[in-house]
Structures are given as C-alpha cells and as structure tokens.
Amino acid sequence: MLKSRKLFPTALLTLLVAAFSLPAPALANHTQATYFEATPLLLSSTTRAATIAQLQRLGVRALRVELSWHDVAPGSNSATKPAFDATDPNAYGWGAYDAIVTEAARLHWKVLLTVTSPAPRWATSNKKAPYVTRPDPKDFQEFMTAVGRHYGAGVTYSIWNEANHPAFLMPQWNSNGTPASPRIYRGLYQAGYTGLQAAISSPTVLFGETAPTGYSKVNVHREHSRALLHDVAPLAFLREALCLNSHYRKSGSCSLLPMSGYAHHAYTIAAGPHYVDPNRDDVAIGTLSRLSNALGKAAAAHAIPANLPIWLTEFGVQSKPNRFLGVSVAQQAEFDAIAEQIAWSNPRVVAFSQYLLRDDPVGGAPGASVHGGTVGFQTGLEYVNGKPKPLYASWPVPLTATKSHGGFSLWGYVRNATGPTTVTVLVRLKGSHSYRTLKTVTTNSLGYWTLGTSARGQFFRVRWTSPEGVRYEGPPIK
C-alpha cells in the first residue's frame, strides 16, 4: 500500500491556539473486543506473573490461547494410542494452560481457546513429525469432549490454527493439484463441534482461523512435489471447506455448518494496512470486504448461518529487524493503529487481536517452517530482549490521523477506560520542537473517540491519565 498520508503543517499559528474543530465523524455502531496473545510468556511459570501485570497495565481484558493437542495428550510421541478414556479430562495433562485460564477467570478476562496442532503422533495418518498429517477425526472428537468438559462454557472455542497453511495441517493439496486441506479441516471441525456438544449444550465455536494468503491453484506439472507445500488461499479454502464452487454455489450434498463466527488472521505486508493483494482469494486487513462478501455469499448458499460475525483472532505488524516484512518501529505503531481502526470501522468485525507481547528471535524466511525451519515474528510491543518499542506506548492509546474535509480526522481509543473519560490531544507544527494542547476530548462509554480539526499539525499524539494516576502518552503520529 501507499504510506500513511503525510500531514501538512498549518500556515497560521492562530489555528493551533484556537484549535478550530470540525464536526466529529460518527462512531461505528458496534463493540469490538480486543484480545491479546502472549502464550509463550504465559505458559512459562517464570514469566507468567510479570506478563499478566504488564497486560493489565496495557489495558488487556481478553486472551487468545492456542492449546496444542500434542502438549496435553497422554503418550503423545508414541505411534500407538495408549489405553485411556479419551473423553475424560482427567486423562490429560493440562498443566500451564489451566494456570492461564484460572488467572484470566480471576481477572474476569475473556478467553478464546484455539485448539490446534500438532496432534499426538498416534492420531496422525503417517505417524511422522511434525504430526500435522490427516489427524483422525474420531480421536479429535473425543479430545474436544474432554476439552469442553474441562473448560466448560465460560470460554470461546476455535478449531485449528491456520488449517490452510502446511505448517499446521497436511496435506494442503492432493497429488492432482486440487485442494486437500479444506475438506480435511471440515471433517475435523465437524468432529470437534460434535465433541464439544457432548460436553456443552450450546458451545460458542469459531470456524476458519485462516492465514491471510495462499494459492488458489497450483501447477503440479511445473513444480512437482513443491507445489503441494503451498498454502491454500483463504477464500479458496473457505469455498472448498463449505462445499461451494467458484461462484459460491453449493457443490455436493454438504449440510449447513453450525458456527458462532468466522476467525481470520488479516496480516498484511510491509506496504502497510491499506495494501490490496492482487490475488482476490487473499484477505489482508486492507481487503476485509472480500471476506465479508464471501461470508454473505456462503450464507445465501445456506452453507453457514446468516450474518456471521468476523473475529480477527491474530494480527500484528512486523517491524525490523525482520528483513522480509519489517517496517520501522515508528511505522509499526502507526500501521497497527490504522489496522485496528479499519477493523473497528467494519460493523461485521466483533474482535481484534494483537499477536505477541515480545518479539520472537529472528528466524528464517517466510515459509521456512514448512521445511522444518523457524519463522520469527517481530510483531511484538517489545524487542526480543524486553526493551519496549514505540508500539508499547501507543497500544494502550492508539491514534490515527487522516486528511478529511480541509482538515484532519483523528480517531483514538483508551483501552483502560471503564466508562467515558477525557483524553488530551496534542499537536506539533513543522519546525517546532514542542507539543501544544489541541483539544481535550471525551470518549464514549467504551473508550473510543473521534475529532475533526482544521489545525494542520505535522505530528499528533495523545495523553491520558487513569483514575489511579497512571499516565499514558502515545508516540508521535504523522
């Protein structure tokens, strides 16, 4: 995408002093829960308490946790399934997952539990690492009954992480070049949903959890076996999993799948949050309308419930030192806020999630995990050494600024707000080294606010002081 529009300085200082205001744009008519995923730090007993304290200061009230089937299952590295009642939660070693869910309950935080691969070795078709090949639906159904009995109706469930990516589910493609993973996933989802129903009468379950990019078709003749390692584009995956053809018409006798929402990971590239991928089956944050339209067509075909909400359950902006997808840390803070505003502006989106508090170590090139390597994500609020990035200061009080009607439209959010509160908006002119108060604005009951202004500052930032006296000040936004 193009970089964020550069804001031009005002020609008259009186505009700054008077802070002439334009009518504020209307707020979107829906709420948007914000989830945070910091599973590696939360799973460790040595970092859990400090991480929870950090998340509280940042304004977190909901967690996404990826629950690995392999981590908790008995005999998970054995080729032979042990003799045990797979529907009995007492047969599993829930370990640190229980500690996370218990702490979240104490804090009255919501929990989204994504149950995912790797599977136990004995539950896969080839019994080979990384244990993601054709997991057995019957085994998964029994496991999900145990999961539901253990964690109950107090959490939201999501079935499988990025099933359209070969690092999490194999095979992605059949030897003839047709997609394989969508129908495998459909079987796993149906089994998992049935398993949860045996434990919970009306479970809240998300479908999809799709990665943002992939291939709509592959050329096995040209690429041979390499073609089968490509990920499946999310909308191509959606259609095949729902038994729809390219025109979103039912193909076959598949019934409607029950679900509470569609989960997606709308990552974008270094071009920024408004980037439009030329593959129309890809869905990044800048092309959310593609997913909205696809879900509408799928509902019209009676493949899914009508008016299905979108959950953006994993998102982050890569920063340097990621040499493939990273932007500067200043741009990371700006792009992250823009992406959240895009999600907030879409009335179908009910959840947005930040992936990583602390960066991973720098790993291999994108796709390295398919070949047994590691991929480091630099989407965190902190560097790998724990030093904060600008995003750490901006995430609790995100701010965007865009040209609008002869002036600028500002949008912001105070995550720690528990009701209407006041925020100080600051502006800095070109050539100036200091900020001045533009206006004090009042948020709505959820903490969101907007402001239209004719004051053309070069940089804007916000300042908010909590009722406990903790001061939050975001970084400069161009």
Residue ranges and their predicted role:
Residues 1-12:
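Bacterial N-terminal signal peptides that target proteins for export
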Residues 36, 63, 104, 147, ...:
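Conserved, mostly hydrophobic/aromatic
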Residues 45-49, 141, 177-330:
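Noncatalytic carbohydrate-binding groove/subsite architecture in carbohydrate-active enzymes
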Residues 18-26:
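C-terminal segment of classical bacterial N-terminal signal peptides
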Residues 27-62, 66-68:
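Boundary/entry segment of secreted carbohydrate-active catalytic domains
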Residues 447-451:
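Short strand-edge motifs at loop-to-beta-strand transitions and within beta-strands
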Residues 79, 163, 168, 174-179, ...:
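Aromatic-rich peripheral "rim/lid" segments of glycoside hydrolase catalytic domains that contact
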Residues 58-227, 269:
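Substrate-binding cleft and catalytic face of glycoside hydrolase catalytic domains
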